[in-house]
């Protein structure tokens, strides 16, 4: 069992309410991490997958084909790396001071956070891989709101600027 902590910015965030698409309820986040901070995590994940491949090799020593590998739980975008971390259960989150976030607080994309995750290797029909499970998290910069927020200003309160041109 490999438990690690990672810091990044949420690109997709279903941490306050579960994603109920495709008939399942899952809490998850895609965490964008700078490449220089992500390399250690990427190497650890590859080691876990490698250990699973070794175990599969022990159980099928006469296999002549390459073992099927599942997609890794991260995507290398060059300057940044996106980590896919999830949980079946609502993860516990804390603010910068260590106080638990209330149920009413909604964590939106662009929030920056530390997430403690457990990296777990697997060998299933889809292939050999690794899954990252959210254990808990701490918010650095919270971006929140509700679905009723309008991205536009109140036009009645905004006064148009009158510009005079000199000819």
Language model features with spans:
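Residue-level detector of solvent-exposed, low-hydrophobicity positions
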Residues: 14, 19-21, 90, 100-101, ...
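Residues that cap or initiate secondary-structure elements
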Residues: 35-39, 89, 123, 143
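Structured, beta-strand-rich domain cores
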Residues: 54-127
């Amino acid at each position: 069992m490999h438990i690690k902590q990672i810091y990044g910015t949420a690109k997709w965030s279903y941490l306050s309410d579960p994603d109920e698409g495709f008939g399942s309820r899952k809490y998850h986040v895609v965490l964008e991490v700078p490449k220089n901070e992500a390399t250690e995590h990427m190497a650890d994940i590859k080691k876990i997958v490698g250990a699973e491949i070794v175990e599969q090799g022990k159980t099928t020593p006469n296999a002549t084909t390459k073992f099927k590998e599942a997609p890794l739980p991260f995507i290398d975008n060059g300057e940044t790396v996106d980590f896919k971390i999830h949980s079946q259960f609502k993860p516990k989150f804390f603010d910068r001071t260590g106080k638990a976030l209330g149920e009413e607080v909604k964590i939106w994309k662009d929030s920056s956070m530390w997430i403690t995750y457990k990296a777990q290797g697997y060998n299933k029909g889809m292939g050999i891989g690794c899954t990252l499970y959210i254990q808990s998290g701490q918010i650095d910069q919270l971006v929140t709101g509700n679905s009723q927020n309008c991205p536009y200003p109140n036009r009645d309160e905004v006064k148009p600027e009158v510009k005079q041109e000199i000819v």
